[in-house]
Amino acid sequence: MLMKTTTVHAPASQGTSGIVLDSLRVAYHGNVVLKPLSLTIEPGEVLALIGPSGSGKTTVLRAVAGFVQPAGGRILIGDTDVTHLPPYKRGLAMVVQNYALFPHLKVEDNVAFGLRAQKQPKALINERVTQALKTVGMSDYAARYPHQLSGGQQQRVAIARAIAVRPRVLLLDEPLSALDAQIRHNMVEEIARLHRELPELTILYVTHDQTEALTLADKIGIMKDGSLIAHGETRALYQHPPNRFAAEFLGRANILSAIALGITEAPGLVDVSCGGAVIRAFSRGSHHGYNKLLCIRPQHLSLTPRSAYSNRFNATLQSVHWQGDLTHLLCDVAGETVRMVLTHVNPLPRVGDKLALWFEPDDAVLIEV
């Protein structure tokens, strides 16, 4: 069930505040839906929490907002333990997908709503509303009513209403999922711009869309079955996922059977038997002789070597799929299917051709089975 868009009418923040979840646990009627979770979101950081439906990501956000009472653990916003505080005392704002603007109020009055609830001076309200609408690019729509706006414009107004109260933390719960693809793409860019303009704002962004997460977040947390199974800086987590679920949830990945043969003289790299060849790949540990999986993103494969250290798989082309700017090739590598994505391939290889697939050691990572 969707929640109403909520602005928490707390006093404006003093400086930046991060979020600390300390062994946070949530249970409904004795059924544990969020296993003990510890996570730190640094002040001014954007953390995207992603995962499939029922993974617990929205439960985390609702607990931070104060709509769910934890069964254990603590929640800190800045230096304040807010675990048992009501939502309106937490100094945060929240926006979800069904923007819930007041239909009888003009845009400017919707944005001013939280400030008026705080009983702020009229001059301050006018200043904050003007600034918030300017920030989201809606200054020219201040006198319109919600029904006169598109879905994307309504979502901008909802975000303006949230930031107008100057929250310490902004919670976004799948705010773009009700929009069509092009508007959603534009709104992702708008939210990224918003954070550039408000770098002191700490954002917890919950989504099932990995593209939104990869575009917006400084760090990503991946949820599964009520547990946080991966967490790290966005680029590092995408490049070197710790396990198969994280690798595949963040985008397409080739997952191949592999055996680690031992460490090399190069820091972080191990020799690996995979795809009928001995290659080098990134590893978080000094594995030797264990059955592992090798993860390689399709776009990290090429038809020509990029360096003297490039790895090589011998492959047979199975199929070619052209999709505008991209060409998708499916290849057989030692009995396993490998996908690669290329741009501007001319001439295109033909089905049945023998190919050499090249990739850099750091673009391949050993992960757990």
UniProtKB/Swiss-Prot annotation:
Its main location: membrane. The lineage of its organism: Bacteria, Pseudomonadati, Pseudomonadota, Gammaproteobacteria, Enterobacterales. It is found in: Cell inner membrane. The keyword S-adenosyl-L-methionine does not apply. Residues 19-250 form the ABC transporter domain. Probably part of the PhnSTUV complex (TC 3.A.1.11.5) involved in 2-aminoethylphosphonate import. Probably responsible for energy coupling to the transport system. NCBIfam families: PhnT. This is Putative 2-aminoethylphosphonate import ATP-binding protein PhnT. Pfam families: ABC_tran, TOBE_2. Keywords: ATP-binding, Cell inner membrane, Cell membrane, Membrane, Nucleotide-binding, Transport. ATP binds at residues 51-58. Belongs to the ABC transporter superfamily. 2-aminoethylphosphonate importer (TC 3.A.1.11.5) family. PANTHER family: SPERMIDINE/PUTRESCINE IMPORT ATP-BINDING PROTEIN POTA (PTHR42781), SPERMIDINE_PUTRESCINE IMPORT ATP-BINDING PROTEIN POTA (PTHR42781:SF4). SMART domains: AAA. The gene is phnT. Induction: Induced when inorganic phosphate is limiting; this is controlled by PhoB. One of its GO terms (cellular component) is ATP-binding cassette (ABC) transporter complex.
